[in-house]
């Protein structure tokens, strides 16, 4: 590969800025399609006399959703002994009775083991914990990369990670995919995946920078470093995306948002690791203190001045 990354870096900055603004616009205007985990709802546990077909139950619930608003967002869990656990949005007593009667007519007789209202406490608590995890993770990343590399690498990596998270969340908001607890897990997974790619590239940049000792322009050092790891990064991401695509196709509706979130996040994570984080390092390098003068009067060229 012979990518001229630094020559077109402004294009990537403009694209990323546009995507961030678009994501913020979607989040503040369209909001999120919150699932039962965050809004609360009703839970029905039923033990059917005969085995229940997942396909038949899904079809029945889809048809019933046009009549009963609480079924527009639902989750079904199947367990041994013909037991089905159905979670829906909040419904009044009249709607609950109608749903239970129609299920009996469509799927056969059952024993109603439990019918309760559930709150959104768990989902809200998880969302709060996820925000704390994101904040703490960003701080730890800053500390770790500052120690292992230097502050310009640390700041660049955190900015790239926040970009990945924001754009992914904006995508979910724009297309109004249901936000549930697995969505939070997907966001945290994206952080780890993107960080791994970024560190691999940064390590190669640092290695080459030390090797040339300032004799080669830093922009060329970045281009050379990215070209050496480009194929590895892309192939790793493609392998993961193929596995996620299979899960999206065959995994059913329960994991739909989780899989879509990971797909989008990994695509943007790969993009940001290569086309955003590295140019950010180049941009931030000009804020470093100028190199000290050596005793013999010669200037230390270990750090080349970067002109943007």
Curated annotation (Swiss-Prot):
List the cysteine pairs that form cystine.
none
Q: Which GO terms describe its biological process?
A: intracellular protein transmembrane transport; protein targeting; protein transport by the Sec complex
Major place of localization? membrane
The record's keywords, sorted A to Z, are:
Cell inner membrane, Cell membrane, Membrane, Protein transport, Translocation, Transmembrane, Transmembrane helix, Transport
Q: Does the keyword Membrane apply?
A: yes
Whether Membrane counts among this entry's keywords is yes
Matching Pfam families, A to Z? Sec_GG (PF07549), SecD_SecF_C (PF02355)
Q: Where in the cell is it found?
A: Cell inner membrane
A molecular-function term among this protein's GO annotations = protein-transporting ATPase activity
What's the protein's topology in the membrane? Multi-pass membrane protein
Q: Where are the transmembrane segments?
A: 12-32, 127-147, 152-172, 182-202, 234-254, 262-282
The cross-references to Gene3D superfamilies, in alphabetical order and at most eight, read:
Multidrug efflux transporter AcrB transmembrane domain
A GO cellular component term found in this entry reads: plasma membrane
> Which HAMAP family does the record match to this protein?
SecF_B
Outline the subunit composition.
Forms a complex with SecD. Part of the essential Sec protein translocation apparatus which comprises SecA, SecYEG and auxiliary proteins SecDF. Other proteins may also be involved.
What is the stated purpose of this protein?
Part of the Sec protein translocase complex. Interacts with the SecYEG preprotein conducting channel. SecDF uses the proton motive force (PMF) to complete protein translocation after the ATP-dependent function of SecA.
Report the family membership: Belongs to the SecD/SecF family. SecF subfamily.
Name used for this protein in its record: Protein translocase subunit SecF
């Amino acid at each position: 590969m012979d990518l001229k990354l630094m020559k077109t870096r402004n294009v990537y900055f403009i694209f990323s800025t546009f995507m961030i603004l678009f994501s913020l616009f979607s989040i503040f205007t369209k909001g999120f399609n919150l699932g039962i985990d965050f809004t609360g709802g009703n839970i029905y546990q039923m033990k059917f006399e005969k085995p229940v077909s997942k396909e038949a139950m899904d079809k029945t619930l889809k048809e019933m959703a046009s009549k009963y608003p609480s079924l527009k967002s639902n989750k079904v869990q199947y367990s041994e002994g013909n037991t089905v656990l159905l979670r829906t949005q909040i419904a009044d007593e009249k709607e609950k009775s109608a749903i239970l009667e129609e299920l009996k007519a469509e799927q056969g007789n059952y024993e109603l083991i439990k019918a309760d209202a559930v709150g959104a406490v768990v989902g809200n608590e998880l969302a709060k914990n996820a925000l704390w995890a994101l904040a703490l993770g960003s701080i730890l990343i800053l500390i770790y990369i500052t120690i292992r590399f230097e502050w310009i690498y640390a700041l660049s990596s955190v900015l790239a990670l926040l970009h990945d998270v924001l754009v992914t969340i904006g995508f979910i908001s724009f297309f109004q995919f249901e936000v549930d607890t697995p969505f939070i897990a997907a966001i945290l997974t994206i952080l780890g995946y993107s960080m791994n790619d970024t560190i691999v590239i940064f390590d190669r940049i640092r290695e080459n920078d030390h090797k040339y000792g300032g004799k080669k322009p830093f922009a060329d050092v970045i281009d050379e470093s990215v070209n050496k790891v480009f194929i590895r990064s892309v192939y790793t991401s493609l392998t993961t995306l193929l596995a996620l695509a299979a899960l999206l196709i065959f995994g059913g509706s329960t994991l739909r948002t989780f899989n879509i979130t990971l797909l989008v996040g990994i695509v943007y994570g790969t993009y940001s690791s290569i086309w955003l984080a590295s140019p950010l390092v180049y941009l931030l390098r000009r804020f470093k203190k100028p190199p000290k003068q050596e005793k013999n009067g010669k200037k230390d060229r270990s750090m080349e001045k970067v002109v943007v």
